UniProtKB/Swiss-Prot annotation:
Pfam families per UniProt: Glycos_trans_3N, Glycos_transf_3
HAMAP family for the chain: TrpD
Pathway: Amino-acid biosynthesis; L-tryptophan biosynthesis; L-tryptophan from chorismate: step 2/5
Keyword flag Magnesium: yes
UniProt entry tagged with the keyword Metal-binding: yes
Binding site for anthranilate 2: R166
The protein's name in its UniProt record: Anthranilate phosphoribosyltransferase
EC number: 2.4.2.18
GO molecular function: anthranilate phosphoribosyltransferase activity; magnesium ion binding
Catalytic activity: N-(5-phospho-beta-D-ribosyl)anthranilate + diphosphate = 5-phospho-alpha-D-ribose 1-diphosphate + anthranilate
Enzyme class: transferase
Protein role: Catalyzes the transfer of the phosphoribosyl group of 5-phosphorylribose-1-pyrophosphate (PRPP) to anthranilate to yield N-(5'-phosphoribosyl)-anthranilate (PRA).
Amino acid sequence: MLFPLLETLYQGKALSQNETTDVFSQIVTGQVDNIILSSLLTALKIKGETPEEIAGAATAMIQNASPVKRPEYDFADIVGTGGDGHNTINISSAAAIVAASCGVKVAKHGNRSVSSKSGSADLFNAFGMKLDMSPAAARECLDKANLCFLFAPVYHAGIKHAMPVRTTLKTRTIFNLLGPLVNPMQPSHMMIGVYAPELVMPFARTLQLLGYKKALVVHGSGLDELAVHGPSMVVEIDGDALNEYTLSPSDFGLEEYPLAAIEGGVPDENKQLIQDVLAGEGQAAHEAAVAMNAGALIKLCGRAETYQQGAKMAIDAMQAKRPLQVIEASSAVSRSHDII
């Protein structure tokens, strides 16, 4: 029964990671009444979710996701929480594609839009990626093209059990924090952008609890990614160590640009803006934003020694049009399989 755990939350006390995993396993398998679920989510929100609770909920979602074979090699994901209120171009999606063209294996987990007019799924779909490809097809994309897209609704069907309550409550809950943490392929390396500075350290501690080999959590002057318009807060996770510092465009050998210079549009417009970037023909601010975030992922995954070297690798790849070749190759593999 959940009542003793609810009582714990009502008293302002935290659940353990294992307790939260048990609770959320019941939620995503449809075993929790909507009124109880509403109380649980509200109590967690008022108390403030701990890293242990967030990690426990994420573990439950991963354990109950549609299975996908995890590679033995290292691979990464780069994702933002969304919800930063700015309609920027798809920086993390473009950075994923660019990093993949520089030798990083990237399994991009994503959904339709949250904060921008065009989410990662919208963009990958515009490039011809079959969103409802099978897990086996996604794994083949990663093996052959260095890049795959994992469309969240394909893997996390259990989330539907919480949707009526989430829709009724009309407020952020722990579920809004889980999207970046529940990649069903379970990457070894992770770069997460968060929408508020106060989330940087809790997310870093959560990633530690989830056992990532290396990870970065960033917040860039109001954005859920590294910023070209100002300084970015960063916490780097390396096993048991947490290293907190600030990054600016100059650390990547890049110029600063105003926030307005990286605003996006509807999916078709975004697709063209990103296609130009991937082909080395993008606007200077767009190219810098993508190079900065791709460069950080490239360094995190050990392909570059410094952030500046990572950004240069990203720019060189874009000018050689390699990212465009990668997304086209991955999309072709995704379409070569039957629909699940």
